[in-house]
Structures are given as structure tokens and as C-alpha cells.
């Protein structure tokens, strides 16, 4: 690696929801003269997502690489002769974007309970940055031979940088009632519980602030695997219009991380958000009721085969509060806020397993690993 020019590194935010994992690394490298930063996103994405992602990426430090087609994007990125290419998943022909000499790394876009975590591992990956020892073991046990490096979860770094003023500004911008506890409701798009709540969600939570953060697919997709997402989208808008205490975050709010800090309890399904919230040792309520498509109602095992890891899904019950029906929400909120201390020891065990070091320095470990691998190559 020549020392006469900066290291060319591109962050490929294939989808906008990949970007929160990259943001702390981008911020770190933007203050490091050894690196020249580039950004890109998939040109085949739906226009509503593509336009928003391009707007966000244009605001980031570095150079945006845009093309009208994926073929043109491949050519433009390959012509950069990158030193490093970072992706958030690897289920596309990465080898066509880079030369054989490019170091390809993956900071995976989620830490949740989906089997895709270990199924998504292209042979073109040179290195994979891993959030915790549990995941290291899981990848190895599923036959992954990529160079695995234990760094911690970069996405969580901002939670440990002590930016209290920013968090206070966030509270004020949402006009949260300071006399009420705050619920962060982060329903995934499928399988989701929000339709089981319906408009009753507003009634069940009248004594709280609610920050409602739907998955981006709720906004961007009309259908997912024959499941209609339009009613979900209509419902979240109706809830925020009818109830003043429900604050809806639009798709432009692509990063949920700051909202963990200003919330008292997380409400969700089996998703990555669980492991992100426990980094702050706050209570998590997991909804065990969903609106399912017919094939998953009839053959529940298909849900676990395609969407969930049964082992991790079962583990959640050890450190979360589980809810079997929507009408239990008022009492479950009280229980979770009062009794979370009973689960702290187990929660801390899972922190160590899933999240390695919660010191705000995962991004530094990613940077140092990149520098080390490039140095050893030369």
C-alpha cells in the first residue's frame, strides 16, 4: 500500500437502512487524512428510497458515486480502483464492483434473530466485522470461513459518546411531555404486531409518550412476499394524526439509535432493536402476537426457517418481557418499568455475548483492522 495517496474506501449503502452501521465509521474516517471516502447506493431501488438515500449520502463527508443503472454503477466504482469496499450485506455481485486487489469488508446491517445473518456471506468477502462472541461462534458453526474480527457493534458507538445536549434537543423537537415515561415502539414490517394493536394503541398508551419508528419497508414497499404492507402504512399515519402523544418518525429518520437514549422502554417484535436497547440496560417488551400471511398461519415452522432463528427467538424470553395479546400492554408497561432490575444480571450476560465491548470504540477497531490488513497485504 503506497503512502503517497490516501486509502480509497467506499461505503456501499445498498439500502438506506444499512447506513446506521456505517455512520460512526464514516464520522471517524472523515477526520483521518489517511482515508478518502466514497459513498454509493443501489440504483435499482424504488424511486422513493433511492431519492431519499441519495439526499442523505450527499450530506455525508466524501464523494457520492451515482449511476442510472447497476451496470454503470459497477463500472464507475470499479474505475475508482478502491483499496477498501464496505458493504452492509453481500447478496449481490460484489466482485463486479471491485478489483481482485480491493479489500472487501462487511459490517452487517442487523444483529437480530434472522438466519440470513450467517446465510448472507459472499465468498468475495475478505473480512467480516462481528458484534460479539456469540455471533462469532454462530458464523463458525455454520461453516463461514471468512476472516472474522471481533469489533463490537459500530452502530451503537454514539450511545457512549456522552452527547447529552443532542439528546435533549431531540426530546424538545418531538415535544415529549417531560412528566411522562416514553415508549419507543419499533415494529418490524413482517411478522409485525402493529396491526393487532390497531387504533387501540393510542388508547392503551395515553399515559405515556410514544415514539413510533416503523421499519423502512413499511414506507417503501406495498407488498413483501405476498404480504400487503399498505394497511400498516395507513395505520401508522392514522395513529399519529389522531393521538397527540404518538410521535411518528418518517423514513428520513433512518437511524433509530438516538431514540433509545431518550426512551424508557422498547416495544417491538423479535428484531435487532432488542439487542440494541439492552446495551443501555433498559426494559424491552417483545410482542408475541402477529398478523401472519396464510402460509405462516398454517405452517408456523416456515416462519422460523425463513425469517427467524428459533434458538435466538427462544432466548429472548430470558431477558425481555413477553406479551401475548395487545390488550395486556398497559399492565405490561408497568411491570417492565418496575421489574426490569430482576432481569439485569441475565441482560448483562447477553450484552457480553452479543455486543462485545460497549465502549464507543467499535469503529476505531474497524479502522485499525482495515489499516492492519492493508499493511500486511503490502
Regions found by a protein language model. Give the residues of each.
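Donor nucleotide-activated moiety binding/catalytic core segment of transferases
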Residues: 68-72, 76, 227-275, 279
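C-terminal alpha-helical cap of glycosyltransferases
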Residues: 359-378
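Active-site and donor-binding regions of nucleotide-sugar-utilizing enzymes
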Residues: 10-161
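Short, flexible/disordered intra-domain loops and linkers
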Residues: 42-48, 218-231, 294-300
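Short acidic-hydrophobic, aromatic-tinged amphipathic segments that line or gate anion-handling sites
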Residues: 63-69, 247-251, 318-328
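Conserved catalytic-core segment of nucleotide-activated headgroup transferases in glycan assembly
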Residues: 18-28, 156-236, 249, 358
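Catalytic binding pocket for nucleotide-activated donors in carbohydrate/polymer assembly enzymes
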Residues: 272-350, 354
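A donor-sugar binding/catalytic signature common to diverse glycosyltransferases
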Residues: 85-87, 100-106, 251-300
Amino acid at each position: 500500500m503506497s503512502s503517497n495517496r490516501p486509502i480509497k474506501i467506499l461505503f456501499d449503502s445498498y439500502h438506506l437502512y444499512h447506513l446506521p452501521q456505517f455512520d460512526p465509521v464514516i464520522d471517524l474516517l472523515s477526520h483521518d487524512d489517511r482515508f478518502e471516502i466514497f459513498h454509493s447506493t443501489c440504483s435499482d431501488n424504488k424511486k422513493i428510497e433511492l431519492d431519499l438515500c441519495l439526499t442523505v449520502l450527499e450530506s455525508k463527508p466524501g464523494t457520492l458515486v451515482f449511476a442510472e443503472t447497476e451496470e454503470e454503477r459497477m463500472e464507475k466504482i470499479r474505475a475508482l480502483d478502491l483499496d477498501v469496499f464496505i458493504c452492509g450485506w453481500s447478496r449481490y455481485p460484489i466482485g463486479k464492483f471491485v478489483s481482485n486487489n480491493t479489500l472487501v469488508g462487511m459490517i452487517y446491517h442487523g444483529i437480530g434473530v434472522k438466519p440470513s445473518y450467517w446465510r448472507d456471506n459472499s465468498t468475495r468477502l475478505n473480512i467480516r466485522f462481528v458484534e460479539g462472541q456469540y455471533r462469532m461462534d454462530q458464523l463458525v458453526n455454520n461453516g463461514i470461513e471468512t476472516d472474522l474480527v471481533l469489533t463490537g457493534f459500530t452502530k451503537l458507538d454514539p450511545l457512549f459518546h456522552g452527547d447529552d445536549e443532542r439528546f435533549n434537543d431531540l426530546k424538545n423537537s418531538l415535544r415529549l411531555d417531560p412528566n411522562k415515561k416514553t415508549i419507543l415502539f419499533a415494529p418490524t414490517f413482517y411478522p409485525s404486531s402493529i396491526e393487532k394493536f390497531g387504533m387501540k394503541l393510542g388508547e392503551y398508551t395515553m399515559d405515556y409518550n410514544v415514539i413510533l419508528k416503523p421499519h423502512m419497508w413499511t414506507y417503501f414497499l406495498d407488498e413483501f412476499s405476498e404480504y400487503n404492507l399498505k394497511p400498516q402504512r395507513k395505520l401508522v399515519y392514522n395513529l399519529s394524526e389522531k393521538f397527540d402523544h404518538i410521535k411518528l418518525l418518517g423514513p428520513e429518520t433512518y437511524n433509530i439509535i438516538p431514540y433509545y437514549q431518550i426512551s424508557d422502554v422498547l416495544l417491538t417484535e423479535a428484531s435487532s432493536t432488542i439487542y440494541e436497547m439492552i446495551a443501555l440496560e433498559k426494559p424491552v417488551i417483545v410482542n408475541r402476537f402477529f398478523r401472519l400471511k396464510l402460509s405462516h398461519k398454517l405452517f408456523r415452522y416456515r416462519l422460523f426457517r425463513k425469517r427467524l432463528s428459533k434458538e435466538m427467538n427462544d432466548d429472548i424470553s430470558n431477558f425481555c418481557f413477553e406479551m401475548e395479546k395487545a390488550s395486556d400492554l398497559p399492565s405490561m408497561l408497568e411491570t417492565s418499568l418496575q421489574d426490569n432490575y430482576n432481569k439485569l444480571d441475565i441482560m448483562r450476560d447477553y450484552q457480553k455475548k452479543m455486543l462485545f465491548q460497549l465502549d464507543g470504540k467499535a469503529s476505531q477497531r474497524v479502522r485499525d483492522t482495515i489499516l492492519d490488513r492493508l499493511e500486511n497485504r503490502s
